[in-house]
Amino acid sequence: MQTALYISVLIISSCGLVYELLAGTIASYLLGETVTQFSLIIGTYLFSMGVGSWLSKYLEKDLIPKFLEIELAIGLVGGFSSAILYLSFGQIRYFQIPLFLLVILIGILVGLEIPVLLRILKKELQFKELVSRVLSLDYVGALLASILFPIFFAPKLGLMRTGFIFGILNVGVALWGTWVLPLRQSKIIILRAQSVVVLTLLILGFSYSDLITYYSEESLYTDEIILSKQTQYQRIIVTRWKNEIRLFLNGHLQFSSRDEYRYHETLVHPALLAHPAPKKVLVLGGGDGLAVREILKHKNVESVTLVDLDSAITNLFSEHGILKELNEESLKNSKVTVINTDAFLWLEESDQTFDVVLIDFPDPSNFSLGKLYTTAFFHTLKRRMNETSVLEIQSTSPLFARSSYWCIERTIASLGFYTLPLHVYVPSFGEWGFVLAGQRPIQFKKKFPKDLKFLNIQELESIQTFPQDMSRVPVEINRLDNQALVRYYDREWNRILD
């Protein structure tokens, strides 16, 4: 019996942590503010476990069958938790209600497990030996789950299937327990029947995960979903309405094929026109290849290095028929080198210098993204530039996130760069901002590449003029130790979305 229960501890501790990680990950995907969501969920989950541990004192008789019933309950609720959360988001206005109800319920049930197990085993071992073995196995199981969840389960199976898999493991513990633990025959029959029912539901859920995911995402997106993919880093959704293609990462619109040319022409061409003879170009982010498409319109460019964290994005936009058509197969051009790694780390390790650096990172909605807009990042980037090099970075909306925009501009200027703020109206986004910078005052060449749809000499002048409601405001410099930009961004966009 001891061995069976020790193995159970290892499994159930892994399951308990995975349910917590699932809730935190889904909340951060759907609601943003990763640090806030994980902090609230972890705190609520741990508190609920404490409540469960306290409630365990009221379980006095038939502890073994009660332990197995707890496992069935956790398997059912935890296994379906991802599906419930995805389906709730599109249907319930206050998504936080089902989110925290599930976290509390799972936390209470998980909190019951270890105290009940300790009481079952108390006659088998000395107390100090019992506690050390059970708790050490509990922590080992949590470690295994924390390693395997981001490396294997989430990217390979997706969040919904991962939930069902660990629910099946919980039920497997209960079903296995009916054979290896001492139980009355009447209890064995009941528990096995319950286990089979719950197991069947979870297997059906696993089998129909794609359908559940499709239905839940269809309720979130008005257009037809033509591609849905979970990677190690993000959820990728591509939608289509007539001839319009849209890319969403973690629920956030990245571009619409109807008007992305306005964004990408403004991101790319001012920087290339500000350099006397750009030959080596570095693109950080921009794995969709749309910025690279614009760069290749400058025939004097000899090489383009694209550094993007997620290989799934660059692979999709290299291989998928519709997507590679959008970027005109730019990622397969012989001038282009694609590197899939962390941009910050790559800059620190590289010894190359570039004439033009274009930065197309996601908005600074969390601290891991916010670090890419800090003085530390731009200081590292500066070492990859020479005296004539220029950089341009997308800088969120100067209208909707005014402080965020000027925080990025001031942070770059604080390192000795001459800056030129730019903005453009993109119908899909509204007003959008960029910052062009160099170690010399910015001067533009007059010769534009052919085939531009938006940018010309007149527009280049107009995008430098900011109306009063987008003009400069006092802001802090964004540093690693203050992450002021993330605070500005959260406050401003939450105000708009609310």
From Swiss-Prot:
PROSITE patterns: PABS_1, PABS_2. S-methyl-5'-thioadenosine binds at residues 234, 308, 342-343. The chain crosses the membrane at residues 7-27, 35-55, 67-87, 97-117, 134-154, 163-183. Residues 196-446 are annotated as: Spermidine synthase. It is found in: Cell membrane. Keywords: Cell membrane, Membrane, Polyamine biosynthesis, Spermidine biosynthesis, Transferase, Transmembrane, Transmembrane helix. The keyword Ribosomal protein does not apply. It comes from the Bacteria. GO terms for molecular function: spermidine synthase activity; thermospermine synthase activity. It is a multi-pass membrane protein. Its EC number is 2.5.1.16. Residues 200-439 form the PABS domain. Spermidine binds at residues 264, 288. GO terms for biological process: polyamine biosynthetic process; spermidine biosynthetic process. Belongs to the spermidine/spermine synthase family. Catalyzes the irreversible transfer of a propylamine group from the amino donor S-adenosylmethioninamine (decarboxy-AdoMet) to putrescine (1,4-diaminobutane) to yield spermidine. HAMAP family: Spermidine_synth. Homodimer or homotetramer. PANTHER family: THERMOSPERMINE SYNTHASE ACAULIS5. This is Polyamine aminopropyltransferase 1. It comes from Leptospira interrogans serogroup Icterohaemorrhagiae serovar Lai (strain 56601). The lineage of its organism: Bacteria, Pseudomonadati, Spirochaetota, Spirochaetia, Leptospirales.
